């Protein structure tokens, strides 16, 4: 991670950390870096979610892009993966999404996509950061005829919706409940599933600029769980603020998380011979029950660090077409370059329709082990060295020996905060509590600062 760019673009509290001034510079410098080798007038797509700060930051960002001669196609409110899809399919130089994903409304973010539809690599981000930190802005300042042109492009959203519908199957009146998190999916999810023939109940579809992710969406699926049971829906589908995640709810009101969604889609593709190298890419946070289910089905797995960017890197490097995270990021590389909650939802309902199985039946093939995660505040310098502390190494090894292969322990530093994360999985909650509490007691005694 750089000075400005985190694991998913530039984020911060809108108007305090992520200011219009910074957004202007990101537009100007980011646009230049991503289009400097273009032979024709560069074109950049810009989208945003429903946050009240979105239009403010969009105006500043667009001004920066126009100032270096870039033509800007303004997409309005739509999902992050829609920007990636449109960049790749319509030959744009780049795309920019203004969103802080599942964060509360006071935050916002700016993330870039290259002309291939993928998020930027570290080298491109470093180029932009170098320009941000330069003492003087020496980029070209074209005169009137060289300035960029601003184009409103609402057709982009319709094209994305049509594309997702084309990947699905008719749902013939299937009862579907949607929670669009008062976010980006509020402009598209209803239309997509109506076009597929679903009978819909929708919540989280009245954004006011301040209620994005507020007690709704993939991080707060409780309301959707109740709606599914009350409406008799076959499935509930909860997206986050920018609709790059999906958490599902089965007909009984039970949560189906990213691990189970990946398993269901992966098994379906594997049985059709369409799972590349018969492998799913996942992260170290995926549940042990997910791993055991894959082993039972003979499906391989590749494991990365936490973060969808690392999943995508591994998929691109090795040619895999399915990967994701427990949190609901699912990347279907045959269809899009990034996690796409609405695409995952369309595929999940297609599998239900084609197999004739309920979501609870499909999800029951994965037995999720109880999991507990505790964050311990430590000095930043110590979080990377924790595993070198003898007492910590010894207690982890002791707990792993006691598990005898029927559980899992993960101790890792936070990528963004002065925290050490201690996670354990085991067959019962009592065992999980024992393993985590025993390890955290030692960690706190040795290096904790609480």
UniProtKB/Swiss-Prot annotation:
GO terms for molecular function: magnesium ion binding; phosphoglucosamine mutase activity; phosphomannomutase activity. Its EC number is 5.4.2.10. Its cofactor is Mg(2+). Activated by phosphorylation. Mg(2+) binds at residues 101, 240, 242, 244. Disulfide bonds: none annotated. PROSITE patterns: PGM_PMM (PS00710). It comes from the Bacteria. The active site is at 101 (phosphoserine intermediate). One of its GO terms (cellular component) is cytosol. This is Phosphoglucosamine mutase. The keyword Acyltransferase does not apply. The modification Phosphoserine is found at residue 101. Catalyzes the conversion of glucosamine-6-phosphate to glucosamine-1-phosphate. Belongs to the phosphohexose mutase family. One of its GO terms (biological process) is peptidoglycan biosynthetic process. It catalyses: alpha-D-glucosamine 1-phosphate = D-glucosamine 6-phosphate. Keywords: Isomerase, Magnesium, Metal-binding, Phosphoprotein. Binds 1 Mg(2+) ion per subunit.
